[in-house]
């Protein structure tokens, strides 16, 4: 069977399964999640064997140490997958919830009901634990899913897929409710993103090149973010202690995440006092600073930033630093260079904080908090399938509710329109 025919078959099966999953009860979907957790626990040896094949092939193909680390399924990571399934099972189910019910002057009642999206396509790279994370969230929210992982994790993903199928079967749900693409042919991605008759939304998780390609070529709506160029702005009304603490955490708590600060903006009124203190903290953590001319004049021995630095998502111990002309300058810089992911202001002035919240056009905007909090778990969503910087449908961390839509429901008692 060629790739196009294979993907069409997966799509047809997913569409049929999505109807059964959508009408299943919360208890049944939770049963499938818990049964999958048990299946993973029982299949540790099989998972380790499959993963070792991927790791061996990865070394032969010259994968770097960071990629191999993301690929590895350690015992602790299997534990985390199992615990993640149990946590998702414990989350409130958004499906079927009716909100905003009101009486209209005509006497009818109008409200909104949460419903599944249908079939969700997930395209991701490297990390096999994403297979479980994504499948569990899609299933809990009443959706079927087709998962296309990276070719480097094919054996691990197929071993996980067998556990998912076992969990679905034990709960009485169709095994085709979660399907992991078994071919490594890259044409499968092209087919998956151009099947609107079978797939309702695509969620890509990977590098910028992958997401740009999917955004350009997809004929299906895409939930995505391209970059995490996040800013912290230290206002002239900032508490210096808070400013130091938040800025250092936003950059150094983890370097390789999309919610890590990549550019630090400092108000010109406090730059002379705060920049040396900030530089000392960052240097102690071996962070390379790249500054504007005013920053270089204050600090002296740092690299001068170029235009590319203001656009950069380093994902590394490198930080761009700019002195700005007050709140106006900070907002102007952020709205020009930000990826609309997460930006934060450090200030004790409520009016200035409100203006920042209103005028900065990002999916998460913060006051006196580290950008590292931009995360579904930290927001109380329980878990997330990704972060969206788009403005239609979901925006920000996308949890269970973001994997549903709404339909209007109307109740009457023989009402007719006159």
Curated annotation (Swiss-Prot):
Keywords: Amino-acid biosynthesis, Cytoplasm, NADP, Oxidoreductase, Proline biosynthesis. Pathway: Amino-acid biosynthesis; L-proline biosynthesis; L-glutamate 5-semialdehyde from L-glutamate: step 2/2. The keyword Cell cycle does not apply. Its EC number is 1.2.1.41. It catalyses: L-glutamate 5-semialdehyde + phosphate + NADP(+) = L-glutamyl 5-phosphate + NADPH + H(+). GO terms for molecular function: glutamate-5-semialdehyde dehydrogenase activity; NADP binding. The keyword Oxidoreductase applies. Coiled coil: none annotated. CDD domains: ALDH_F18-19_ProA-GPR. GO terms for biological process: L-proline biosynthetic process. It comes from the Bacteria. It is found in: Cytoplasm. Belongs to the gamma-glutamyl phosphate reductase family. PANTHER family: DELTA-1-PYRROLINE-5-CARBOXYLATE SYNTHASE (PTHR11063:SF8), GLUTAMATE SEMIALDEHYDE DEHYDROGENASE (PTHR11063). Catalyzes the NADPH-dependent reduction of L-glutamate 5-phosphate into L-glutamate 5-semialdehyde and phosphate. The product spontaneously undergoes cyclization to form 1-pyrroline-5-carboxylate. This is Gamma-glutamyl phosphate reductase. It comes from Marinobacter nauticus (strain ATCC 700491 / DSM 11845 / VT8) (Marinobacter aquaeolei). The gene is proA.
């Amino acid at each position: 069977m060629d790739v196009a025919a294979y993907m069409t078959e997966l799509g047809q099966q997913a569409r049929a399964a999505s109807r059964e999953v959508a009408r299943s009860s919360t208890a049944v979907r939770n049963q499938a999640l818990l049964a999958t957790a048990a299946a993973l626990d029982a299949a540790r040896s099989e998972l380790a064997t499959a993963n070792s094949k991927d790791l061996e092939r990865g070394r032969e193909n010259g994968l770097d140490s960071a990629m191999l680390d993301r690929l590895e399924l350690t015992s602790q990571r299997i534990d985390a997958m199992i615990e993640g399934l149990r946590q998702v099972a414990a989350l409130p189910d958004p499906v079927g919830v009716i909100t905003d019910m009101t009486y209209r002057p005509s006497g009818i009642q109008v409200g909104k009901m949460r419903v599944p999206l249908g079939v969700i396509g997930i395209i991701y790279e490297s990390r096999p634990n994403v297979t479980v994370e994504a499948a569990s969230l899609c299933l809990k929210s009443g959706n079927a899913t087709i998962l296309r992982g990276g070719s480097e994790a094919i054996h691990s993903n197929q071993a996980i897929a067998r556990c998912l199928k076992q969990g679905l079967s034990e709960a009485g749900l169709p095994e085709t409710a979660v399907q992991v693409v078994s071919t490594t042919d890259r044409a499968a991605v092209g087919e998956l993103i151009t099947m609107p008759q079978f797939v309702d939304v695509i969620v890509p998780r990977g590098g910028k090149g992958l997401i740009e390609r999917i955004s350009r070529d997809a004929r299906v709506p895409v939930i995505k973010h391209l970059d995490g160029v996040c800013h912290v702005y230290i206002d002239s009304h900032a508490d210096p202690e808070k400013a130091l603490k938040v800025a250092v955490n936003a950059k150094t708590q983890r370097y390789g995440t999309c919610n890590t600060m990549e550019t630090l903006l400092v108000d010109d009124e406090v730059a002379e006092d705060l920049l040396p203190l900030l530089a000392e903290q960052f240097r102690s953590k071996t962070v390379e600073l790249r500054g504007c001319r005013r920053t270089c004049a204050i600090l002296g021995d740092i690299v001068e930033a170029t235009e590319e630095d203001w656009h950069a998502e380093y994902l590394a111990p490198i930080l761009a630093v700019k002195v700005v002309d007050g709140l106006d300058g900070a907002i102007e810089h952020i709205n020009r260079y930000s990826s609309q992911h997460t930006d934060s202001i450090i200030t004790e002035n409520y009016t200035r904080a409100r203006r920042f919240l209103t005028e900065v056009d990002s999916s998460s905007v913060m006051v006196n908090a580290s950008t590292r909090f931009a995360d579904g778990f930290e927001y109380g969503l329980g878990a997330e399938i990704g972060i969206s910087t788009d403005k239609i449908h979901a925006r920000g961390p996308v949890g269970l509710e973001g994997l549903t839509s709404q339909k209007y429901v109307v109740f009457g008692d023989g009402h007719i329109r006159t």
